[in-house]
Amino acid sequence: MTLSFITRWRDELPATYTALSPTPLNNARLIWHNTELANTLSIPSSLFKNGAGVWGGETLLPGMSPLAQVYSGHQFGVWAGQLGDGRGILLGEQLLADGTTMDWHLKGAGLTPYSRMGDGRAVLRSTIRESLASEAMHYLGIPTTRALSIVTSDSPVYRETVEPGAMLMRVAPSHLRFGHFEHFYYRREPEKVRQLADFAIRHYWSYLEDDEDKYRLWFSDVVARTASLIAQWQTVGFAHGVMNTDNMSLLGLTLDYGPFGFLDDYEPGFICNHSDHQGRYSFDNQPAVALWNLHRLAQTLSPFVAVDALNEALDSYQQVLLTHYGQRMRQKLGFMTEQKEDNALLNELFSLMARERSDYTRTFRMLSLTEQHSAASPLRDEFIDRAAFDDWFARYRGRLQQDEVSDSERQQLMQSVNPALVLRNWLAQRAIEAAEKGDMTELHRLHEALRNPFSDRDDDYVSRPPDWGKRLEVSCSS
């Protein structure tokens, strides 16, 4: 089957990119590819059998027209000016059979005009982390970019140490970022901001294109998508680590996996990025940061969208966030209805977990085994203050009884939303260290496990992290 690529971005937004081709690595070789995703995208298996090929930037497929995008942004709350694809190249936009499109974005593809002081490369460590994280999030049901392939090489890349150069093929319906809009707003080119908005609406919100109120309705949906995404992050204990405006997806996708982390111990102020000295991007601050970023996007639209309309959309953010968060947390607790005491019960559990440094994922998974008429629970042994747990657990079981739902039905619901497996940093690190020694077994094994996060397991993937694996802070270097 021949893949079809189109050039909408190149044709319709000429001010937003520089055309250039990838720079191949030395002795590049394909070490992993996503068979399930490749099948979804109707990619012939033969493309994965001919060396690095397109996956290593050595060849282009017919119809591809590679380019590096320019954008700007606020980083850690400070205007950073022009940024852009410093090591990534958009190879093309695949046209799928249903009429939708999928960007093919090659990360680590070499120098671009937007590399600034960088070398245009990515390292094996970071490409493995992004591949694992994006696929983990996908199978958790959270909107995200996807990973299609990883190529490693003999090219040395200099970070804190010398690491092997690598490339990741990332795919997504769009790589539109808040930073694209900021770039032209701060260059005082509002007509180009409007062109970006029109492009987004035409291709991703086409049902609004003929509406005279399209910009307000579109921005309201961007706000809602962002609020929903952040709510989902919070419910699974995901910390992004670097929520700069240039890392914010217009479509509400999780984008740019760098120093991310999933909670081990429940620590609301968890900081996964060792460069985040002020804790701006701490776990509990993510909802506020996302709203701040939306305000920056709204500012770029103010030349052609009424400020009152923008503010109305921004004002809806918190309610959308709380609605999505509340719905999912009630499911995680096994509540079939909404009762006034639900928030208090959840907050009391969080307080107890924070005091005891309880494991976030394991706590909710074990809670899924609760029998409403039995005071016995395997979760009890996870707490030192048994009296405090017993008091909370008795009230929790009383709340479950109000719903008049069988244990089996409720447990099934809870186990479908409380994962047994999340991508803990130590699991990723173990796969990385093996891969850097040439052994890809653990990389493939972990990828396969992450496809079924809600299935029961009895291996170390679902155990508490070892001492060395706790509080692994990660840098932005990739």
UniProtKB/Swiss-Prot annotation:
Entry EC no(s): 2.7.7.-, 2.7.7.108
Xref: InterPro entries: adnlytase_SelO, SelO
Question: Which residues take part in binding Mg(2+)?
Answer: 247, 256
Q: Where does ATP bind?
A: 84, 86-87, 107, 119-120, 170, 177, 256
What keywords are assigned to this protein? ATP-binding, Magnesium, Manganese, Metal-binding, Nucleotide-binding, Nucleotidyltransferase, Transferase
Q: Tell me what this protein is called.
A: Protein nucleotidyltransferase YdiU
Presence of keyword Nucleotidyltransferase: yes
Query: Which GO molecular function, any one, fits this protein according to its record?
Result: magnesium ion binding
Q: What family name appears in the similarity comment?
A: Belongs to the SELO family.
Catalysed reactions, semicolon-separated: L-seryl-[protein] + ATP = 3-O-(5'-adenylyl)-L-seryl-[protein] + diphosphate; L-threonyl-[protein] + ATP = 3-O-(5'-adenylyl)-L-threonyl-[protein] + diphosphate; L-tyrosyl-[protein] + ATP = O-(5'-adenylyl)-L-tyrosyl-[protein] + diphosphate; L-histidyl-[protein] + UTP = N(tele)-(5'-uridylyl)-L-histidyl-[protein] + diphosphate
Is ATP-binding tagged as a keyword?
yes
HAMAP family in the cross-refs: YdiU_SelO (MF_00692)
Highest taxon of source: Bacteria
- The protein's gene is named ydiU
Residues of the active site are 246
Species of origin reads: Escherichia coli O139:H28 (strain E24377A / ETEC)
NCBIfam families, A to Z: adnlytase_SelO, PRK00029.1
Q: Name the top EC class.
A: transferase
Give one Pfam family. Answer: SelO
Required cofactors, per record? Mg(2+); Mn(2+)
What's this protein's function?
A: Nucleotidyltransferase involved in the post-translational modification of proteins. It can catalyze the addition of adenosine monophosphate (AMP) or uridine monophosphate (UMP) to a protein, resulting in modifications known as AMPylation and UMPylation.
